[in-house]
């Protein structure tokens, strides 16, 4: 790995993980962060993989710089979700959506991969949010952690996202008080 890139990404990861209290990271069972390059899952280049059994977050330091900070929180949410599926219930989450909407069967069997924020949200922040419920939750969480003001503005105009944001915030509060 290029030392300059590694140092830069290490700084970004440290800065973003320092937002979380140590006690919270213990509660969600995150112990290790592994940095790698050119990470793939099912032939798709991916930004990160949460390994729940090993309590590890694997992050690709070469992943698109534009999304890198958000990716850290997105993957942290997968660790949270895996340890607190009862708090972040996917059926309750899915009920927030328009009744005509259906998620894909799995995130890797969907071509909904875009990570850019929609101009018109209609209940979803990104194309990737539309893949499966857990990815939708992770996208909402990642934007909440990196741009609270933008999320507040979006929530004021999008009632579906308002409900999703409140659901995530309340779930995180439950874990902190756990």
Predicted features, each with a name:
Residues 1-4, 151-153:
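Charged, low-complexity surface segments at secondary-structure and domain boundaries
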Residues 28-178:
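Active-site-flanking segments in enzyme catalytic domains
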């Amino acid at each position: 790995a290029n030392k300059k890139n590694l140092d830069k990404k290490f700084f970004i990861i440290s800065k973003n993980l320092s937002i979380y209290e140590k006690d919270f990271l213990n509660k969600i069972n995150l112990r290790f962060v592994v940095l790698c390059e050119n990470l793939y899952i099912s032939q798709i280049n991916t930004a990160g993989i949460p390994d729940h059994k090993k309590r590890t977050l694997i992050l690709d330091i070469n992943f698109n710089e534009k999304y890198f900070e958000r990716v850290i929180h997105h993957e942290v949410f997968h660790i949270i979700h895996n340890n607190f599926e009862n708090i972040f219930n996917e059926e309750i989450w899915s009920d927030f959506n328009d009744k005509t909407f259906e998620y894909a069967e799995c995130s890797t069997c969907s071509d909904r991969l875009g990570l850019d924020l929609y101009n018109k949200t209609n209940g979803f922040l990104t194309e990737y949010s539309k893949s499966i419920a857990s990815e939708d939750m992770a996208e909402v969480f990642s934007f909440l952690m990196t741009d609270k003001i933008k999320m507040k503005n979006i929530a004021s105009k999008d009632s579906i996202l308002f409900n999703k944001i409140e659901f995530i915030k309340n779930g995180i509060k439950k874990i902190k008080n756990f």
